[in-house]
Structures are given as C-alpha cells and as structure tokens.
Amino acid sequence: MASVVLALRTRTAVTSLLSPTPATALAVRYASKKSGGSSKNLGGKSSGRRQGIKKMEGHYVHAGNIIATQRHFRWHPGAHVGVGKNKCLYALEEGIVRYTKEVYVPHPRNTEAVDLITRLPKGAVLYKTFVHVVPAKPEGTFKLVAML
C-alpha cells in the first residue's frame, strides 16, 4: 500500500514539472523609458551678503556706527564695542577704531569653547581678534583735583 502511494506521489511530481506552464504565469517585460524628473538647479545665483569690516583701523566712528558684520564670531567685541542680535559689532562711544590680537579666555559656562580649550595641547594659547573703540574725549577729569 505504501509503495502505491509513493509511486503516485512521484508520478504527480514529475508530471507537474513536465507539463507546460500557463501563459498567465509567464511575466514579460518590455522596454520602457521613465519620465524625466522636474528638478531644476535653482539658487546659487544670489549675490553675497556683504559682510565684513565696515570701519578699518584708525577710522573715526560715532556712537551706533556699525564696525563689522559677521555670521560667526570672527572679530570679538572689546572696549566700547557692542554686539547686535546678528553678531554685528557697533560702537558704543565715538572715537577711533583699533584692532588687537589678544589671548582668548572663554567664559566657564560656554561649553563649546571649554571643550575646544581642553582639546588643545598643554601650554597652548588661543589668540582672537578684538575690536576696540578708543574714546575721542578723555573720560571725566575732576576739576577739584586740578585746582589743588
């Protein structure tokens, strides 16, 4: 009995392999062309932002004059210089503009600067450019002291 069942199974397996496959089972692919994309090279033709130094070393500035515009701190504020919302530097008093290179000591709460300092080799010093305005008129002198 078992041999008859085994013979029937093998016979059906062989006939299913040798029988022709139906036409619906065959997949036929024809050549096709995908439609072109609609991307364009937009932008890249805009003019520059005109950032940089507006007042050079030795120029006379009035209070409120913009000294430099910048995206990131390339120049740092010094004496009598303020910082705008967009990191532009402006004069707080009228006087003459001076640029100096000074040792940069970051605030301890500034984590990015502290991480940079700790990655430097021992004994290395960071120098940054600072912008100062030297006031034109001397700061208050006491007349009573001059009268003595």
Swiss-Prot record:
Transmembrane segments: none annotated. It is found in: Mitochondrion. Keywords: Mitochondrion, Ribonucleoprotein, Ribosomal protein, Transit peptide. The keyword Transit peptide applies. The keyword Transit peptide applies. Pfam families: Ribosomal_L27 (PF01016). Residues 1-30 form a transit peptide. GO terms for cellular component: mitochondrial inner membrane; mitochondrial large ribosomal subunit; mitochondrion. InterPro entries: Ribosomal_bL27. One of its GO terms (biological process) is translation. GO terms for molecular function: RNA binding; structural constituent of ribosome. PANTHER family: LARGE RIBOSOMAL SUBUNIT PROTEIN BL27M, RIBOSOMAL PROTEIN L27. Belongs to the bacterial ribosomal protein bL27 family. Component of the mitochondrial large ribosomal subunit (mt-LSU). Mature mammalian 55S mitochondrial ribosomes consist of a small (28S) and a large (39S) subunit. The 28S small subunit contains a 12S ribosomal RNA (12S mt-rRNA) and 30 different proteins. The 39S large subunit contains a 16S rRNA (16S mt-rRNA), a copy of mitochondrial valine transfer RNA (mt-tRNA(Val)), which plays an integral structural role, and 52 different proteins. This is Large ribosomal subunit protein bL27m.
